[in-house]
């Protein structure tokens, strides 16, 4: 039986043609505004499509052929989505990468994906490669060239590669099909509540996959307008831009909301804003409640990953309550599976309220085709018909999912598994704490303790934090040590790098 909420997959399809379909219906509508306090650079749907297909023709003139990889080493500029869509338009495979990567990291990627072309912004690090390198300064000359034709084909064919954030220690190239964009229709309805009338302002950079999907591909797919701040826009400027450019939706990572709140000294009203969106890492209840109090707006959170984008979310028509993350989007098949069925546990979904691994069915059109040149790693992520996310959660009686953290991040307290998310949620409510990350750190061989790392104006006594936790957490979950740091380490995707925190054995120097 076909799920009426699942997207229809056509026999012939091209992701770029789908995303830019409104260029033929509303060619003069503004598709993109790149904004600053000084003004805006605007692109119509007609201009976006012309630039994309002009670039695509230029790529073909370089004798690139279907399946060739195009590595994007581009900064926070409009060239990023244009090159991405141009490659997709003619069956090349774009490989978007973070501008923060070092030359050493880029060299590894070049070895892995063997690009046929690198599009390079001179301000961004790259590495030597046995392929042509096209400077971003050369791209505008191609925008007005002869437009290429969209190459239609099997919707299940390889469309693009994206790299994971490397939470397991090794970033992997994830293969996605052209059809993956269609799975995002379930997000439009059950996260964004998105329509062609919206103006979605995304606080992220062009060269971040969260911005690329939520901030650009999705608005364009429905004929809406995307609004992106210029590079290096300060967080305290974002409220002004939201007002001035009539944003109806605002999307950002949790850290951006926190930075805006830290600079607000009075409540603020956004006349056109309907609601806000958050993803990338867990949104703390404290940030969500502070934002609601200062703006009157609700932040709707979503959970996903490079391998499947977002598939659990809250939305205006189905808000999350309490500490839950949200609900499986309609059209998705999501389950909580036992962490270790080989230890005598059942193989199917665990009972309601029981912790386990969040899994999504392998029939999901947004699920990856696999990891690039890594069939064994791909197989290890599958259990029967389910893809294992590596994240822990528990399903509630109403179907919502409570998020408990990455499997890799789970801590061990005397043999009892503890979620860092649970501890962080409580500590984030302590007055004075701005950000917090919790992990276990080895004190000596085979002995680890739970440590909380936090940012704040001043040190907060361990005893004060322990007393705060005592009424809220079981004793074995309370951090044995709390350390104030200047900032929390993050990986190139902006997520907290707990692996780096686990290595902080220096915090025990001088202690017995």
Over which residues does each language-model region extend?
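Conserved AMP-binding/adenylation subdomain of ANL enzymes
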Residues: 182-199, 207-249, 263
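Conserved AMP-binding/adenylate-forming core of the ANL superfamily
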Residues: 31-77, 81, 85, 102-107
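Gly/Ser/Thr-rich phosphate-binding loop
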Residues: 247-252, 261-321, 333
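Conserved beta-loop-beta connector loops within the AMP-binding
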Residues: 335-361, 397-398, 458-462, 497
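AMP-binding/adenylate-forming catalytic domain of the ANL superfamily
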Residues: 474-496
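Conserved pre-ATP/AMP-binding loop-to-beta segment of ANL
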Residues: 12, 27-30, 145-163, 170, ...
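AMP-binding/adenylate-forming catalytic core of the ANL superfamily
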Residues: 101, 118, 364, 369-370, ...
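Conserved AMP-binding A3 loop
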Residues: 42-46, 159-183
């Amino acid at each position: 039986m076909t799920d009426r909420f699942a997207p229809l997959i056509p026999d012939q399809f091209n992701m770029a043609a789908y995303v830019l379909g409104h260029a033929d219906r509303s060619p003069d509508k503004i598709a993109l505004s790149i904004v600053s306090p000084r003004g805006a650079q605007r692109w119509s749907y007609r201009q976006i499509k012309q630039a994309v297909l002009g670039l695509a023709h230029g790529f073909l003139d370089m004798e690139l052929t279907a399946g060739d990889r195009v590595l994007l080493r581009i900064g926070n500029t409009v060239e990023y989505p244009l090159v991405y869509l141009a490659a997709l338009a003619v069956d090349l495979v774009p490989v978007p990468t973070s501008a923060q990567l070092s030359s050493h990291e880029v060299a590894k990627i070049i070895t892995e994906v063997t690009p046929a072309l690198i599009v390079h912004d001179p301000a961004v690090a790259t590495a030597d490669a046995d392929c042509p390198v096209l400077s971003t300064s050369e791209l505008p000359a191609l925008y007005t060239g002869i437009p290429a034709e969209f190459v239609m084909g099997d919707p299940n064919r390889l469309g693009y590669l994206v790299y994971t954030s490397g939470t397991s220690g090794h970033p992997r190239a994830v293969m996605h099909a052209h059809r993956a964009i269609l799975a995002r229709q379930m997000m439009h309805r059950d996260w964004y509540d998105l329509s062609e009338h919206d103006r979605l302002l995304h606080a992220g950079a062009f060269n971040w996959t969260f911005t690329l999907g939520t901030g650009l591909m999705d608005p364009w797919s429905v004929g809406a307008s995307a609004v992106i701040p210029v590079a290096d826009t300060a967080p305290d400027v974002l409220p002004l831009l939201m007002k001035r450019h009539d944003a109806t939706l605002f999307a950002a990572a949790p850290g951006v909301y926190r930075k805006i709140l830290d600079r607000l000294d009075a409540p603020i009203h956004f006349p056109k804003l309907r609601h806000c969106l958050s993803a990338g890492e867990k949104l703390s209840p404290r940030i969500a409640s502070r934002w609601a109090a200062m703006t009157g707006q609700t932040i709707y959170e979503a959970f996903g990953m490079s391998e499947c984008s977002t598939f659990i979310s809250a939305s205006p028509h189905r808000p999350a309550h309490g500490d839950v993350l949200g609900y499986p989007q309609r059209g998705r098949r999501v389950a909580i599976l036992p962490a270790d069925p080989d230890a005598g546990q059942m193989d199917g979904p665990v009972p309601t309220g029981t912790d386990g691994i969040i899994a999504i069915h392998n029939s999901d059109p947004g699920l990856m085709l696999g990891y690039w040149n890594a069939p064994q790693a791909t197989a290890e992520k599958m259990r029967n018909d389910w893809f294992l996310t590596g994240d822990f959660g528990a399903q509630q009686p109403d179907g919502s999912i409570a998020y408990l953290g990455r499997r890799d991040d789970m801590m061990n307290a005397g043999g009892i598994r503890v979620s860092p998310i649970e501890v962080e949620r409580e500590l984030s409510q302590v007055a004075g704490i701005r950000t917090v990350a919790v992990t276990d750190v080895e004190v000596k061989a085979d002995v680890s303790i739970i440590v909380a790392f936090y940012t704040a104006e001043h040190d907060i006594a361990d005893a004060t934090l322990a007393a705060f936790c005592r009424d809220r957490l079981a004793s074995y979950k309370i951090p044995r040590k709390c350390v104030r740091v200047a900032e929390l380490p993050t990986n190139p995707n902006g997520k907290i790098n707990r692996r780096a925190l686990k290595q902080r054995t220096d915090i025990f120097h001088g202690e017995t």
